[in-house]
């Protein structure tokens, strides 16, 4: 059951480095993260990615300065971004009452079989098996969606023994040989199929206190996206509680309102930090993106 929840929650910490990515790369964090997943870590491809994604909307001088800074401090920057995401994701998983197995699986998601990953440079069997499986699954999904099954299989073989545990690759080969495996991934009922896989023996009573903790945790995920909104959801919940009390609402009603307040900005995760943290006036398209956060 730990693998199931590791896979679903592996990106819990992603919002925590979004603002930093925008600051360093002068770019849209959403497209940056999406495209970076296709980079295999080789220096030529990393450099090509940096040049192709840094400061495209900035002035020439500003762009050159950003690229030079990234090239000079690339290793430190990569370590900072991944360390932040992995640590935050693992912490939130624990806050959601998942055990150390799930938390460790999330924390070590970017470790590579050959020891070249991050954040701890773990190697081989020292990497939690949940992380080894999740990393391969993530790469397969990215390349299958963008370029098809053949491209996904090629990437797995290319990274076997470097990024990926050969034993996990061997298991994937057996799955990939079955046409039904790929057909299910593109089937309209995929979400329902994933929910049906939930391990029945892992049952946690969903009481009122647990619901509160879930709302608090996801409020923190949202607030971590931008330094300008740190603690915002918690403060809105506090204001909501005070107003509801003044209106004479009962405790149960106030509790639900607090949860709604903590989660009111969930859709902000779908808005780029290039928009959220922009120091100047937003243009028409940027305002439209901000307004869509309620829909998200």
Can you describe what each PLM-predicted range is?
Residues 1-296:
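Histidine- and acidic-residue-rich, metal-dependent catalytic cores
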């Amino acid at each position: 059951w730990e693998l199931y929840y590791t896979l679903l929650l592996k990106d819990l910490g992603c919002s925590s480095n979004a603002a930093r990515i925008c600051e360093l790369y002068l770019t849209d964090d959403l497209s940056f993260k999406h495209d970076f997943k296709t980079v295999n870590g080789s220096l030529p491809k990393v450099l090509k990615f940096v040049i192709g994604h840094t400061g495209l909307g900035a002035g020439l001088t500003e762009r050159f300065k950003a690229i030079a800074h990234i090239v000079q401090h690339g290793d430190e920057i990569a370590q900072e971004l991944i360390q932040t995401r992995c640590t935050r994701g693992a912490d939130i998983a624990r806050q959601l009452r998942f055990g150390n197995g799930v938390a460790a699986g999330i924390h070590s998601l970017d470790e590579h079989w050959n020891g070249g990953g991050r954040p701890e440079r773990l190697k081989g069997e020292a990497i939690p098996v949940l992380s080894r499986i999740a990393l391969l699954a993530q790469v397969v999904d990215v390349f299958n969606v963008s370029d098809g099954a053949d491209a996904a299989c090629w990437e797995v073989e290319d990274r076997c023994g470097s990024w990926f545990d050969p034993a996990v690759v061997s298991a994937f080969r057996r799955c990939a040989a079955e046409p039904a495996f790929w057909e299910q991934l593109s089937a309209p009922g995929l979400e329902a199929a994933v929910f049906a896989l939930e391990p029945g023996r892992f049952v946690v009573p969903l009481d009122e206190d647990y619901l509160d903790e879930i709302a608090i945790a996801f409020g923190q995920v949202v607030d971590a996206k931008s330094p300008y909104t740190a603690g915002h959801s918690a403060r809105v919940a506090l204001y909501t509680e005070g107003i509801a009390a003044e209106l004479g609402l009962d405790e149960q009603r106030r509790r639900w309102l607090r949860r709604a307040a903590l989660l009111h900005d969930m859709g902000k995760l779908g808005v780029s930090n290039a928009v959220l943290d922009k120091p100047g006036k937003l243009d028409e398209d940027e305002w439209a993106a901000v307004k869509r956060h309620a829909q998200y």
